[in-house]
Amino acid sequence: MWPGILVGGARVASCRYPALGPRLAAHFPAQRPPQRTLQNGLALQRCLHATATRALPLIPIVVEQTGRGERAYDIYSRLLRERIVCVMGPIDDSVASLVIAQLLFLQSESNKKPIHMYINSPGGVVTAGLAIYDTMQYILNPICTWCVGQAASMGSLLLAAGTPGMRHSLPNSRIMIHQPSGGARGQATDIAIQAEEIMKLKKQLYNIYAKHTKQSLQVIESAMERDRYMSPMEAQEFGILDKVLVHPPQDGEDEPTLVQKEPVEAAPAAEPVPAST
């Protein structure tokens, strides 16, 4: 190794071979350090801002006092102790694997205590959502589903898949159902195979919605032909959920406060019009 070699040629072969300095310096012309300009500063600022936005979100840490001292949990692990599972964001294979693992763990602890699943998802991959759905139906625990924010596409299917009577939503959430979408490329035969597969998935999803909403297949097909957005009250009438909650039971209350459907005022009776001759 040649210590002392600098790109700028200020110090070349400074230790053992000083005679090589002029020769090597001729091949490495002096370079000035880049000057800091306004454009460079703005570019650096934009780069740092983009890096910060791509960084993973911070997960809060909960510290609890125990008889053996302090114990720290990340917030999702602490909620898991209370049998709460969060399905947040797009549903893909990684989210499905985490949710399935939590469901199986909670069943191993007790197969009778309910599991609370909070959903705020725009949907995602159909096969990943069906993996969560099948696990929900497989385990023995009753599952309470809660819609916070939105439950769209596969999110609405998971919301409807909760135990009957235990499917909830907060009053300002949005629910959306639609038919599956996808694309295919390649040879004509391959495209035909993909089209046949997505049609099978479409019928499979229709049957699942019909099972949990108690609607006929004709009603489901008509509702899911295009994006169908619903308020919590509309989703309750459709059969996707059972209750729209304002807040949990307070002291002295047996049941949580529900959003009541506003009564429709009857139109005033029209006065009879005298017959004209």
UniProtKB/Swiss-Prot annotation:
Protease component of the ClpXP complex that cleaves peptides and various proteins in an ATP-dependent process. Has low peptidase activity in the absence of CLPX. The ClpXP complex can degrade CSN1S1, CSN2 and CSN3, as well as synthetic peptides (in vitro) and may be responsible for a fairly general and central housekeeping function rather than for the degradation of specific substrates. Cleaves PINK1 in the mitochondrion. It comes from Homo sapiens (Human). The active site is at 153 (nucleophile), 178. It catalyses: Hydrolysis of proteins to small peptides in the presence of ATP and magnesium. alpha-casein is the usual test substrate. In the absence of ATP, only oligopeptides shorter than five residues are hydrolyzed (such as succinyl-Leu-Tyr-|-NHMec, and Leu-Tyr-Leu-|-Tyr-Trp, in which cleavage of the -Tyr-|-Leu- and -Tyr-|-Trp bonds also occurs). Disulfide bonds: none annotated. This is ATP-dependent Clp protease proteolytic subunit, mitochondrial. GO terms for biological process: membrane protein proteolysis; mitochondrial protein catabolic process; protein quality control for misfolded or incompletely synthesized proteins; proteolysis; proteolysis involved in protein catabolic process. It holds the Pfam family CLP_protease. It comes from the Eukaryota. Its EC number is 3.4.21.92. Detected in liver (at protein level). Predominantly expressed in skeletal muscle. Intermediate levels in heart, liver and pancreas. Low in brain, placenta, lung and kidney. It is found in: Mitochondrion matrix. PANTHER family: ATP-DEPENDENT CLP PROTEASE PROTEOLYTIC SUBUNIT (PTHR10381), ATP-DEPENDENT CLP PROTEASE PROTEOLYTIC SUBUNIT, MITOCHONDRIAL (PTHR10381:SF11). Coiled coil: none annotated. Belongs to the peptidase S14 family. The modification N6-acetyllysine is found at residue 211. Keywords: Acetylation, Deafness, Disease variant, Hydrolase, Mitochondrion, Protease, Serine protease, Transit peptide. NCBIfam families: PRK00277.1, PRK12553.1. Changing residue 153 to A/C: Abolishes protease activity. The lineage of its organism: Eukaryota, Metazoa, Chordata, Craniata, Vertebrata. Fourteen CLPP subunits assemble into 2 heptameric rings which stack back to back to give a disk-like structure with a central cavity. Component of the ClpXP complex formed by the assembly of two CLPP heptameric rings with two CLPX hexameric rings, giving rise to a symmetrical structure with two central CLPP rings flanked by a CLPX ring at either end of the complex. It is linked to Perrault syndrome 3: An autosomal recessive, sex-influenced disorder characterized by sensorineural deafness in both males and females, and ovarian dysgenesis in females. Affected females have primary amenorrhea, streak gonads, and infertility, whereas affected males show normal pubertal development and are fertile. A spectrum of additional clinical features, including cerebellar ataxia, learning disability, and peripheral neuropathy, have been described in some PRLTS3 affected individuals. Its main location: mitochondrion. GO terms for cellular component: endopeptidase Clp complex; mitochondrial matrix; mitochondrion.
